[in-house]
């Protein structure tokens, strides 16, 4: 939905504090739908067709390396799943390498049906694609089976097509309970997690008392290991409920899970390396994004894994020299869910318009996303870390109707000194000022455009200015949520 089709009441949504109360900022929650206003002026283009890819599309798809990756460049929610779904048609294997059910990827099949995936790789909609959940992923089996049931009820078979690493760690309900208790304990300093138990599960992994998928093959010792986790949680949190009955029920539940999961369990490290030797094409689907990386993100307001290029190797067990093209997915503006610094955040009417037009509510949590201008400083930082070969600019259509669009091109301090790089210091990030470059917007509806040359001149100028500033070419441009709403440049 483009911006020009919206007008907002002075206070269209009730306001609430963000989860962490970061700097006293406020966020809107869903309320009455925005009112429609005058229709858009359509750009003169031929109707889009999805029967055969264009020459530009074929060129881009066929030139990708044997092992390629798709990673987020902001704070998640960039639209990675859609690109993976499209690219997967040209790949033999699609793999997840890190994170868990905190990653929410919304994709659409050829009939326009919407699927919200959290653990299962987005390539599952392509019937000839093998999907892999790698050793770096943490797996919540109840959620995993729920996704599979939802897919199979819609005619999408997962049997024989979905492999789960025997080295991946199990995420239990207890991890989700601990996640919530930890957030309550932190009070006003809470991180604003998805409360999916990701952090506590990775914590057990690092302290070497977690359980892995392979432990499901040894139910004689499974109960004792799970008992250690439950007991530790009860000792740490007084409100954590734990007794022998709970342990027995959990063990019985996981006996059933073990039987159902067995056909999926695979030594995926061996599978991935054999696939490389067999010259199969492999696409890696990153969860979250670089600005949430445990090392490179806005720590501590980050995730617990490495959603950067380095996480591909550690999360799948493949060599760095195997990697080829890495595509960075970047929204045409910036969004963030939860707490943490956000230098280019828009707190007024324009931010509300972006949120409403872009339907900016989290796939995993439903929380309203904070919105702001595209942050070039942060984007360049992500490009340096990951070595992107190209970018996928998404949701360009959402900016339609804005008379002026801004790019945050540099940071400076109160005394006027330029900050040369993206800082680790959160206090500095909170106080930092942003220098903006303003570009003219466009009024035309671009959602049906499939040829780059048919975009309004000002839209092309926006894309090309981003390329100039970050030094990375934009090869893919999203102009709508549908699978076909993509321009190959």
UniProtKB/Swiss-Prot annotation:
Organelle transit peptide: 1-54
Binding site for substrate: 363-369
EC number: 6.3.4.4
Subcellular location, principal: plastid
GO molecular function: adenylosuccinate synthase activity; GTP binding; magnesium ion binding
Catalyzed reactions: IMP + L-aspartate + GTP = N(6)-(1,2-dicarboxyethyl)-AMP + GDP + phosphate + 2 H(+)
Cofactors named for this entry: Mg(2+)
Residues binding GTP: 76-82, 104-106, 369, 395-397, 478-480
A single BP term in Gene Ontology: 'de novo' AMP biosynthetic process
Pathway: Purine metabolism; AMP biosynthesis via de novo pathway; AMP from IMP: step 1/2
Residues annotated as catalytic: 77, 105
Protein family membership: Belongs to the adenylosuccinate synthetase family.
Subunit-structure text: Homodimer.
Protein name as annotated: Adenylosuccinate synthetase 2, chloroplastic
Protein species of origin: Sorghum bicolor
């Amino acid at each position: 939905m483009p911006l020009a089709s919206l007008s907002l009441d002075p206070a269209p949504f009730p306001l609430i504090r963000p989860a962490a109360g970061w700097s006293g900022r406020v966020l809107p929650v869903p309320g009455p739908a925005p009112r429609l206003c005058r229709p858009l002026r359509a750009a003169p283009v031929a109707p889009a067709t999805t029967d055969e890819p264009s020459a530009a599309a074929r060129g881009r798809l066929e030139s990708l390396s044997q092992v390629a990756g798709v990673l987020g460049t902001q704070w998640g929610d960039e639209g990675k799943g859609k690109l993976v779904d499209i690219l997967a048609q040209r790949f033999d294997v699609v793999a997840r390498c890190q994170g868990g059910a905190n990653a929410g990827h919304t994709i659409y099949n050829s009939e326009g049906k919407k699927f919200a995936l959290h653990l299962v790789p987005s390539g599952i909609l392509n019937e000839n694609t093998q999907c892999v959940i790698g050793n770096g992923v943490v797996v919540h089996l109840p959620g995993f089976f729920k996704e599979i049931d939802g897919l199979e009820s819609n005619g999408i078979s997962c049997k024989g097509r979905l492999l789960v690493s025997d080295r991946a760690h199990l995420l239990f309900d207890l991890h989700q309970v601990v996640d919530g208790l930890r957030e309550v304990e932190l009070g006003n300093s809470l991180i604003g997690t998805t409360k999916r138990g990701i952090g506590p599960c990775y914590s057990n992994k690092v302290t070497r008392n977690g359980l892995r998928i392979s432990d499901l093959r040894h139910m004689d010792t499974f109960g004792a290991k799970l008992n250690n986790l439950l007991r530790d949680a009860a000792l740490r949190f007084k409100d954590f409920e734990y007794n022998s009955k709970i342990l027995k029920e959990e063990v019985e539940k996981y006996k059933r899970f073990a039987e159902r999961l067995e056909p999926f369990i695979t030594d995926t490290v061996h599978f991935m390396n054999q696939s490389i030797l067999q010259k199969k094409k492999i696409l890696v689907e990153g969860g979250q994004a670089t600005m949430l990386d445990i090392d490179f993100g806005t720590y501590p307001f980050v995730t617990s894994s490495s959603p950067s290029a380095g996480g591909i190797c550690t999360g799948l067990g493949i060599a760095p020299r195997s990697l080829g093209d890495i595509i960075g997915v970047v929204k045409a503006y910036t969004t963030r869910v939860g707490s943490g610094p956000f230098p280019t955040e828009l707190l007024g009417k324009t931010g509300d318009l972006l949120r409403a037009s872009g339907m900016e509510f989290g796939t995993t949590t439903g929380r309203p996303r904070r919105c702001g201008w595209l942050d070039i400083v942060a984007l360049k930082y992500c490009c340096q870390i990951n070595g992107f070969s190209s970018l996928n600019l998404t949701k360009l259509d959402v900016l339609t109707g804005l008379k002026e669009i801004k790019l945050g091109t540099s940071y400076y301090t109160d005394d006027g000194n330029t900050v040369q790089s993206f800082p680790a210091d959160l206090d500095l990030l909170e106080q930092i000022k942003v220098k903006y470059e303003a570009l003219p917007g466009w009024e035309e509806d671009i959602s049906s455009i499939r040829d780059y040359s048919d975009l309004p001149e000002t839209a092309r100028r926006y894309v090309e200015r981003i390329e100039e500033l970050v030094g990375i070419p934009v090869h893919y441009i999203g102009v709508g949520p549908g699978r076909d709403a993509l321009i190959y440049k």
